[in-house]
């Protein structure tokens, strides 16, 4: 097992990565919120909810509050959330607001949740069609990434999550990117050491960003949105998995950076080659109508400021800058998602 700690406004969070983790050490008397269909790793009172984005509703939130109240939870209690990213989002919001904050331990069970959603302190619920409209920043006491959960993960879901891993290398750590390129076959085979390295290094990289910009006030945390400006629009229009859309978005945004003179030409092709080896899409067979729909979504990106979108731009592998990019240039980047043949 490997572990590290990161600091934040509430103190320190322990992050553990390995197999057969001792959950009881982190929550001796847990109240367990667990995704339906998963075996509970802990004994104690539990509430089961469906996974997926639909769980991030006020109805689900009320059920969690009622569960905590029925169990007599107070500020010394610990909620242990076991599941994918959406359930962890809900749990974070619930723990951060119930009695103005109770203990929280997160147990992500998907690769995407491990390398992305679990770390950062964000909790939210959706309001109608608007995702994450109501939210909090609330850091957990511990994040327990037990790699045993990943052995039964469907192949497409596993590969999709690797887009976020590639993002860390592309934007923040060229050495990690090179390691991924050299070890991609072992990662795809889910070799224990390779998967542990993927999860551990991804979390270390993200933690280094969260530590210096916990509340998204300095612009540094924007780097975690590389590939997401275009990717979010692609995800909504084409119905891809999140990581698949981010993969397409990474390549499109790198091409945009090349066109604008920020990035050496050929970098986008190099990254696209790695993503293709992973089995992820790097372009889409899109109609003109679909591209226009995606462009219209970019106009409503939350990072937009007037005629510009404040977005992270990669200038070389492992390095980035925060730039105001004209909306027209971002719309042109959407054109890059279309396969040339």
UniProtKB/Swiss-Prot annotation:
Compartments reported by the entry: Cytoplasm
GO BP field: amino acid biosynthetic process; aromatic amino acid family biosynthetic process; chorismate biosynthetic process
A Pfam family assignment: DHQ_synthase
Gene Ontology cellular component terms for the protein in this record: cytoplasm
Coiled-coil features, chain-numbered ranges: none
Residues that coordinate or bind NAD(+): 85-89, 109-110, 122, 131
Main location: cytoplasm
Keywords tagged on the record: Amino-acid biosynthesis, Aromatic amino acid biosynthesis, Cobalt, Cytoplasm, Lyase, Metal-binding, NAD, Nucleotide-binding, Zinc
Domain of life: Archaea
Cofactor names: Co(2+); Zn(2+); NAD(+)
One of the record's GO molecular function terms: nucleotide binding
Cofactor note: Binds 1 divalent metal cation per subunit. Can use either Co(2+) or Zn(2+).
UniProt: Zn(2+) binding residues: 164, 228, 242
Catalytic activity, reaction form: 7-phospho-2-dehydro-3-deoxy-D-arabino-heptonate = 3-dehydroquinate + phosphate
Enzyme class: lyase
PANTHER family: 3-DEHYDROQUINATE SYNTHASE (PTHR43622:SF1)
Family: Belongs to the sugar phosphate cyclases superfamily. Dehydroquinate synthase family.
NCBIfam families: aroB
Protein name per Swiss-Prot or TrEMBL: 3-dehydroquinate synthase
Organism: Pyrobaculum calidifontis (strain DSM 21063 / JCM 11548 / VA1)
Gene: aroB
């Amino acid at each position: 097992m490997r572990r590290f700690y990161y600091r934040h406004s509430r103190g320190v969070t322990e992050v553990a990565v390995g197999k057969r983790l001792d959950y009881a050490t982190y929550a001796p008397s847990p109240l367990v919120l667990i995704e339906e269909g998963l075996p509970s790793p802990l004994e104690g009172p539990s509430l089961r909810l469906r996974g997926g984005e639909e769980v991030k509703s006020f109805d689900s939130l009320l059920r969690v509050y009622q569960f905590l109240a029925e169990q007599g939870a107070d500020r010394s209690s610990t909620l242990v959330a076991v599941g994918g990213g959406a359930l962890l989002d809900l749990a974070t919001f619930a723990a951060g607001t119930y009695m103005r904050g109770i203990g929280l331990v997160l147990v992500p069970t998907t690769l995407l949740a491990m390398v992305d959603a679990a770390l950062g302190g964000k909790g939210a619920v959706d309001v109608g069609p608007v995702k994450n409209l109501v939210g909090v920043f609330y850091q957990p006491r511990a994040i327990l990434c037990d790699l045993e959960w990943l052995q039964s993960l469907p192949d497409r879901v596993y590969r999709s999550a690797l887009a976020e891993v590639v993002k860390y290398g592309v934007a923040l750590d060229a050495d990690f990117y090179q390691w991924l390129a050299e070890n991609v076959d072992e990662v795809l085979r889910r070799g224990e050491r390779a998967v542990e390295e993927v999860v551990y290094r991804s979390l270390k990289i993200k933690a280094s960003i969260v530590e210096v910009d916990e509340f998204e006030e300095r612009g540094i945390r924007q780097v975690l949105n590389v590939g997401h400006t275009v990717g979010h629009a692609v995800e909504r229009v084409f119905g891809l998995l999140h990581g698949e859309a981010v993969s397409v978005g990474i390549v499109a945004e790198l091409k945009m950076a090349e066109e604008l003179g920020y990035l050496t030409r050929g970098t986008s092709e190099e990254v696209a080659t790695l993503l293709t080896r992973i089995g992820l899409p790097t372009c889409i067979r899109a109609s003109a109508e679909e591209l226009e729909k995606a462009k219209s979504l970019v106009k409503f990106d939350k990072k937009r400021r007037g005629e510009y979108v404040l977005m992270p731009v990669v200038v070389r592998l492992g390095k980035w800058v925060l730039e105001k990019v004209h909306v027209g240039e971002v719309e042109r980047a959407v054109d890059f998602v279309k396969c040339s043949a």
